[in-house]
Amino acid sequence: MIGDPVMLTIRRNIQRPSKALLKSFDGMPTGFVTDAYNGKGCLDFEIKPLMPAMAFHGPAITAYCGPMDNLAAMAILDFAKKGDVIVIATSGDDTAATIGDLWAFWAKKIGVAAIVCDGLVRDVAGLLKVGIPIFARGIKPNSAFKHGPGEVNMDVTCGGVAIGPGDIIVGDRDGVVAVPLAQVEQVAAQLELVKKKESEAEARVKGGEKLKFWDPPALGDRVRYID
């Protein structure tokens, strides 16, 4: 081998969605977003918020950290901008925590909207004081090394979903949904239709109407009654 092995691969310049497209996701729950995206984009259900009131949305910047390592997570703070969602992929590594409270403090100081990690975190008491939305697979006090290899702003798989820099990430107490940058405009248009239908259905239920969630005549003899 000529020279030392590469410890980090970093893409410094990425495309983010427009402010207008981001605004179309304001206040939209994850259920609406995945419905508008044809039921796709949901990260693994094991990735949960540290506390319930942690709704967010924003463009992804991504880090890949190898087992028991967080070098890429440290480096990504130099490339984060206000409103970004830091997505940290670890291939579900459970050997050590990827981030802690001091790291989260600096992320919040930058103005990061949220952190999503398919690995583990630590310093929970401190993380809750920082107050930034954090979604992770679990908690463990072990600290990680900073040896690499790692990647920043490359395509990753987090929670079973392919995510690239600039994709829109939406999270709330139900989970996390990722919408690819190339699909954002289409999903944003569908969101308005989903919101309209949900609002109409809610008004009908509150008005006393029993909604028809299934249609027995349409199923015909494919329904078997046993009494």
Model-derived features: positions:
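Channel- or pocket-lining gating/hinge segments that regulate access to a cavity or pore
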Residues: 175-177
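Beta-strand-loop-alpha-helix segment that lines the small-molecule cofactor/substrate pocket
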Residues: 172
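C-terminal binding/interaction regions
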Residues: 169
